[in-house]
Amino acid sequence: HEAPGQFEHGRMMRTAGPCSNAPARSLRCRPAMQVTAHDVQQAHAAIKSHIQHTPTIEAPRLGEMLGLRLWLKLETMQFTGSFKDRGSCLKLQRLAQSANPPAGVAAASAGNHAQGVAYHARRLGLKATIVMPLTTPFSKIERTEGLGAEVVLRGESVAESTVHAKELAAQRNYAFVHPYDDPLIVAGQGTAAIEMLADQPAIDTLVIPVGGGGLCAGMALWAKHVNPNCRVYGVQTAMCPSMRAAIRGEPVPAMHTHTLADGIAVKTPGVVTAEILKQLVDDILLVDEVDVETAVQVLAAQQKVVAEGAGAAGFAAVTRHAHLLRGRNVGVVLCGGNIDRRMLATVLLRGLKRDGKIAKLRIAIHD
């Protein structure tokens, strides 16, 4: 059993931004955005029969350790193991129902977006081609093919794969499905907030991982609509803080995408999502690799929940920045659980070694 506070590491990366304590303005006073709370509500009505209404569970022991009340939304329990089911479901459903439906869909992804698109394409009877980087682990390729998609390996990065996916889409009369910078994707991801705040209306603070920003943008739209004083914090890693730089108008620092939280290591944030987050998010908090590793370990040991690095980033931020949240009712989205088993084993073993719970003995015995 972990002792109180033992998973808090280092000093704080930063304090809350200047807007964190300011009263939220009414959405009607802000410049128009490409997605609205009404869009999120309509998305929920459209997809709720085709996705999992995932549970939002209280974690009283962890909350007590941190001086707050804590709820965890288990998007790890979606059909494909992540929140990506939501946006993919809405986008593909609209494409399939359009007057001129495409011959199929194409996407570029090395992870959860690939599986979300593949799953819902098969459900809707659409052909799906997923372009993955050449370095994609075989386990991810196998899972995506197992959901009925054609996998094409092309490019050294997701950015290069995206170029090829768009070319394939044009050649085959397919629709290209962007992982986050699409109003329908944002609206679909935002349905997680409808469930979460309906299930636990006491929540007054949301902590949400941010890669391209689709999940955080969609959830912020609904949360601020329901309660303008609800705080919304995004979370990125210190190795890849692209969205934080974008919404602050700061130079984008050198990005490192080789991180345990690779699902949110996005170099190019969305235009649609950045505009929403710039207006609605209270701050974007940073976490480091040890924070993320420890969050994965604590969630597995104490909550019996397996989260991938990106999925655990929100909880990592709550532990690192607990002083910002003390006394509040905090909802954290565990946005994905698709972690490679070997990686999970490595992370758990490192945690046991760090906590002094594994010892190596070397015994020399005379023959």
Question: Across the structure, where does each feature detected by a protein language model lie?
Answer:
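PLP-dependent amino-acid enzyme catalytic core
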Residues: 32-367
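Short linear motifs in low-complexity or flexible loops
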Residues: 3-4, 15
